[in-house]
Amino acid sequence: MVKELEEQREEILRLYQELKPSQRAFSPAPHKWNLLQVLRHLVTAEIQSVAYINKKLKSRSGIPEAGIGSYLRNLLLKTALKLPFRFEAPKIAEVKDKHPDFETMISEWDTVRKGIQKLIEQSDEATLARALYRHPKAGMLNMKQFMEFIEVHIAHHQKQMKRIMKHPSFPAE
């Protein structure tokens, strides 16, 4: 799953690197995110998520098993993100900066992805199967479910990226 997530990330980075700064900063309407803000949201969501998982892993004791409830909540979450609806970002992953720095976000995303890889390598399967991650809406999920969430979350926002770039006022190359 790490490989698939990395391929997805590389696809987004290739796309963004091909765009001009004015295209990355284009907002389709007032109070709507531009491409930089979409990327900021994705990177922030992963940073906050990994920080929470690391905090849970430090306590080690009292981490519950991820049971059928986690499975069902994850299924609902993945289904919701595949639907053509738009959701307001949870406060923890809100984007306040209108023009986040692209290079900084690339660096942060590299770092958080290395952190995910390290987490997986340094944890045994029994630990990774526990409810380590708290999604703001879906509740507690295990590491595999967290990775699945990242994948569908990014795919959800890739649709948003395409909508922004198809906007009639999107700057020409």
Residue ranges, per PLM feature:
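Acidic interhelical loop/turn segments
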Residues: 17-29, 89-100, 118-146
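Internal catalytic-core helix/loop-beta-alpha segment
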Residues: 95, 99-111
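Carboxylate-rich helix-loop segments that flank metal/cofactor sites and access channels
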Residues: 64-93
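Structural signal for well-ordered, non-membrane alpha-helices
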Residues: 9-17, 47-50, 54, 113-121, ...
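Hydrophobic packing residues in well-ordered alpha-helices of helical domains and bundles
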Residues: 5, 35, 105-109, 147-150
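Short, contiguous alpha-helical
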Residues: 28-75, 126-173
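Extreme N-terminal tail/first-helix region
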Residues: 1-11
